[in-house]
Every structure is written in structure tokens, then in C-alpha cells.
Amino acid sequence: MSLSKMSMSGMSGMGMGSSSNSSAATCRMSMLWNWYIHDSCFLAKSWHINTGNKFAGSIIGIFFFAVAIEGLSLVQRMFDRWIVAHSNGKTLSGPLRIFFPSSTVHVTVWQQLIRAAMYSSFYLSATILMLIVMSFNGYAILFGFVGAWIGFFLFASDTYGTPSTGTGCCESR
């Protein structure tokens, strides 16, 4: 059996817990680029795709999942801007000012916990998308990347920068 067409049932000697005598449909796994639609799996055997409709739903879901990751990134930036806008000029005093400039906004423990939770959600989501793309299914890769592209287009226009005001000390003319 070639690696490019290996099924989960053919991997019974590899500790996957399935037997080669199983009559149930199996996942077609490939370590090479593939365009499998039927009997493809993403992430786990429980995400087994055995119909065209399930595959279409999965691919559309992957697309919107990638878009949502970029949306989550926007929510993170909006929360950071909200913290800065509501900081009321709170900065550190005393010996800690040596390590943290006075222009730095310092967040409360609760704000930092929320920021950490949002970052962890972003990181987990991006990792899951990476694992889905590592199925080497061309459709999953294509729709994952197109979803990220559309998501960036929709949600990242605020990251380009701000127009120059001419007040900077080191602006080039």
C-alpha cells in the first residue's frame, strides 16, 4: 500500500486502535498533497467526511473559521485601544519607572487576564487551522488561505498606520 493512498485501517499495526477487518468506512490519510473528497478526515476520525454535502460544509466552515480568526485579532486590537482610551494617564511611579517608560499604559490584572484569554483563543484557533491545513487536502488549504485573506481584507484595514502629522522629530521629508 503506498503512503499516498493509506487508509486508517491499513495502519492497524501502528497503534491507531483500528483493525484491518473493520467493515466501517475509513479515513483516507495522505502525507502528500491530495484532493480527496469522500472518506477524508480533518483533525480526527470523528470528523470523517463521507458525502459531498459534508465536505462542502466542512470546507465552508474552514473558510469562515479562518475569517473569524482575523476577526478575533481585530477584537484584540479594539480592546487594547479601549484600555489606552480609558487609562486616564495611569503610569507607574517610583523605582519601577526605570523599567517602564511613563508613556507606557499599564493595565489592571483583570484587563491583562482578558487580553491573555483573547490571545490564547487566537493562538488556539490559529493552531487548529494549521492542523486542518496539515491534512494536505488541497481544498482545505485553498479555503483556509482564502479565508485568512478575506478576513485580513475585512478586519485589518486599521493596522496600516496613521497619516503623518508633521510633528515627529525624525520624519523624513
UniProtKB/Swiss-Prot annotation:
Cellular location(s): Membrane
Function according to Swiss-Prot or TrEMBL: Required for high affinity copper (probably reduced Cu I) transport into the cell.
Topology within the bilayer: Multi-pass membrane protein
Keywords: Copper, Copper transport, Ion transport, Membrane, Transmembrane, Transmembrane helix, Transport
Organism: Schizosaccharomyces pombe (strain 972 / ATCC 24843)
Glycoprotein as UniProt keyword: no
GO molecular function, one term: copper ion transmembrane transporter activity
Family label: Belongs to the copper transporter (Ctr) (TC 1.A.56) family. SLC31A subfamily.
GO cellular component, one term: plasma membrane
InterPro entries with a match to the protein in the record: Cop_transporter (IPR007274)
Transmembrane intervals: 55-75, 136-156
Segments forming a coiled coil: none
Protein name: Copper transport protein ctr5
Residues exposed to the Cytoplasmic side: 76-135
The keyword Thylakoid is assigned to this record: no
Any one GO BP annotation for this protein: copper ion import across plasma membrane
SS bonds (residue pairs): none
Description of what induces expression: By copper deprivation, and repressed by copper sufficiency.
Topology Extracellular: residue spans: 1-54, 157-173
Assembly notes: Interacts with ctr4.
